[in-house]
Each structure stands twice: as C-alpha cells, then as structure tokens.
C-alpha cells in the first residue's frame, strides 16, 4: 500500500448567507481555490490524475461540478473528475476516496475537497413537469430540502440537535456558552491573522469595482446576554437557537494529496501524512453524536488512542451535538477547535469536511503539534473522521 501525503491545503474565506459570495458560483470559487492550491504545492495542472469534489446542493449547477472545475483550472481533459454527495460529509468523503485511489496505486496526485454556495441554491417546483392546468404551484427551497432536512423523520436538522440536547442533558446555558467560546476563539484567530495562510483571496466584481474577499465574514460579536435572548429555532420548548447553531454559508476548500514517493521525487513540501479514516452510523434522529463513533473507529483503524491526538477539529453543526461528542469521548476542550468552529466560522455543507481539515493542517504546522484528528456529523445519521500526522 502506498503512503499518502498532503502537499497543499487551501480554502476560501467563508461567506455569510446572501453575503459577499452570494453571486460567486461554486464553480468559480472552486477554480480559484484549486489554482491557488496547485501554486502552493509546486505541482503543474498536468501532474493531477483526478479531481474528486464534494457538493450537496447540485441543482442548477450543471453536469458534474467537479469536472467543470477541473477543466476551468487547466487540468487536462484526459484526466477524470467526479462529484460526491454525502451531505455534510461530502468533502471529507472526497478526501477519503482520493486517499484510497493513491493508496491502491490507481492515481499518484489527486485534488479533493468540496464546494458549496448555499446562497445560490434554487427553488424547485415538482408541479411543472406535467404542467399545471390551474391553481397555485408549490415551490420547494432546495437548500432546506436537499441539505438541511432529515428525510427519515421529515424534520429540520435542528430538531436532531434538540434531540441530542435532551438525550445528553445539555442545558441551554451550556450551549450558549459553547457558542460564545467559539465566537471568541474565531475572532482572536482572525485578529491574529492565523487563517491568512490557508485562505485564498477571491476577487469579486461589483458596481464600485473589484473587492478582494479574504476574511471569514460570518463571525459576529456576541455575549451570553444576547445569546440568551434568542428564541428556540426548531422546537417551541427546545434549547437550540440560531446563536448556538452553525450558519448557512458559502465557501470552497481544496486539498491536494500525493503518493509520498512521488512527492519526494518531485521535491514537494508535505504538510502531513494521512494515517487513516473512520466511519460511524447511528439513528438519524440523533445524527450529531456520530463523530464520537467515527473517531473511535478511526483510532482503532490506525492503532492509536485518544491520548495520541494533539489537536481535534470537530465541525460545530450545533453546540448541543458538539458538547455531546466532547462528553462521549471525554475530550480536553483545550485541544478542540482552538481557533473556533463552524458556529463562528460557518458551515458551507459540501465544503465543511475539507475546511476543518485545512484549518487543522495549518494549525498543526503553526503550533508544531504532530497528530491531529478532524471529524464531523452527517445528516441521516452518519459520521466521518480522519487522522493526520506530521513527520
């Protein structure tokens, strides 16, 4: 089996819903970040064997968004590309598939990650295929229907977070405090320019000229008092609010994986070695607890234990599920999401799995920590995890 290394990890800044990236398509974002990642790696477009990208809200994007991004980025058309939809796990699953292709010897260099513009998700009408003879036509929000709605229980993902809060006895106060800490850590990281190296600036044309978007815009100033004033967002008597949940966001994340021997032969700098992955499954109605299962399976697969991990990046879909995972694994919160998480930074669903790994890799490089783990929950009751190591 071939050893697989990371030779580049880049992302866009994360845009707020209907914010700076609202008119920048997933294709355009992906091309911009992919080109920057290639430049950072020292590879040429012709060195790439395959492109594998996660995307959830594919309606209206045209055929195979990964192939569109591949060709627009200058990667030759005799190479291949495909898109992956595993809801929030899409881009991490893309990374796993890329890793496996290299490990098994099918490819040597694979671009992977994910793209998502939730702001541009279209409305759908299932009434129009055969026409409407009279009366109103129903419109479906594809962002909610395809990205945020539990297909098994017919309710919003937020209900699953309330279910986890109830099952694990997590109070509203604990959730709000967790959310506040995420915001404070993210703001401190932005002020210290910790994300600068991982972010690809994107030029956006508007009526006033060209604006360079290069800083996460979703983090917001907040207090426990302001969080406490928010009403429950999903259940009338629930504890999950807009303030202790992740956002609806836009962004792209790209990672380039390479056969270790190939990287050495080309003289490429490596950020980390991929040690392995873990998957987990649970009941869809408490999907947020699944990272704890995925991480346990991941560590078993790579013959490590929790004490071997120096840093964790856990996607903060909701404060409730994040706290539950911390409790379930008995993790030290001081080594988890040290620069804030999705509650502050945002959650562009098809790109988030790669986003947390990009951030983890750069924090490991900055801090010198040797082993890291990134994990996230997946709508429908699944979880994904990856362990990486600096050598």
Regions found by a protein language model. Give the residues of each.
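N-terminal extracellular/periplasmic Venus flytrap/periplasmic-binding protein-like
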Residues: 11-12, 23-27, 31, 40, ...
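Beta-strand segments within the central parallel beta-sheet cores of soluble alpha/beta enzyme folds
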Residues: 46-54, 80-85, 110-115, 174-181, ...
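Conserved active-site "lid/cap" helical segment
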Residues: 1-61, 65-73, 77-80, 160-172, ...
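Active-site pocket-lining segment
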Residues: 159-162, 195-198, 275-344
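Flexible glycine-/small-residue-enriched beta->alpha junction loops
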Residues: 109-163
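Active-site-proximal alpha-helical scaffold in enzymes
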Residues: 86-116, 165-194, 254-261, 326, ...
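Conserved catalytic cysteine-centered active-site region
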Residues: 55-110, 152-156, 221-247, 328-355, ...
